[in-house]
């Protein structure tokens, strides 16, 4: 299986800014055929670390591999059997067509829309492999089974020997643009991308399609603070809150302080 990695996520512009974007990964075996196991799950290439994308950015291995620690949020979802793949990346628009603000879109990419599910991911596997140049990488494989309203599209793509299956990770990365390195801070899931399937990985690796600037959105510490405030408001009203509104660990991994600013009162007001 030959991976062509080009990840999606929140890409850092400055120490206090990250940007939501989308990049692609194409995966298939040498014959273009993936065979399911006895339970109907396909061992599907999802991503790779310790490798570069077509823009030359290097996906640092240690931070990527750390996302697969047993106690990570990602692996907890795998253990609970609730890691699902969506058909296409979430777009930063509300149902009425208006553009989401930053904290709305951040919450959206951290959740799964049941109406967009195309597969269930049963297991994640890290294996030692090599890239197209023979350099060592960590390949991410997932045991995926067609499921949900868009499961038929995933199955049609994965069983067609003439058609590539494209997946793209939803992750949060911090970038070092001077050194050309991406550090992974959080993985939400993987999405199937490419409407109806794409013939050949090179079509998506062309320079004209490498950058998705129209989908980028700047995220700052204030964005996480707004998500945190919304979580506190829901708790105070007695509502149950999902993990997507808990940004404490995410803020720590980004090195951001999202605690409210306390203004000292002037002496004459004490």
UniProtKB/Swiss-Prot annotation:
Record annotation: effect of changing residue 168 to A: Complete loss of enzymatic activity
Answer yes or no on keyword Protease.
Answer: yes
Question: Its principal location?
Answer: virion
Q: Which GO terms describe its cellular component?
A: virion component
Which of UniProt's keywords are assigned here?
Autocatalytic cleavage, Hydrolase, Protease, Serine protease, Viral capsid assembly, Viral capsid maturation, Viral release from host cell, Virion
Q: Which GO terms describe its molecular function?
A: serine-type peptidase activity
Q: Please name the InterPro entries in this protein's record.
A: Peptidase_S80
The family database entries (Pfam families) matched by this protein are listed as:
Peptidase_S80
GO process annotations (BP)? proteolysis; viral procapsid maturation; viral protein processing
Q: Site (Cleavage): which residue positions?
A: 210
Active-site positions on this chain: 89, 168, 191
EC number(s) on file = 3.4.21.-
The superkingdom of the source organism is: Viruses
Question: PTMs?
Answer: The self-cleavage of the C-terminus allows the activation of the protease.
Q: What does this protein do?
A: Serine protease that is responsible for cleaving many of the prohead proteins during a major morphogenetic step in viral capsid maturation. Cleaves the major capsid protein at 7 [A,G,S]-X-E recognition sites.
Q: What is this protein called?
A: Capsid maturation protease
Q: From what organism does this protein derive?
A: Pseudomonas phage phiKZ
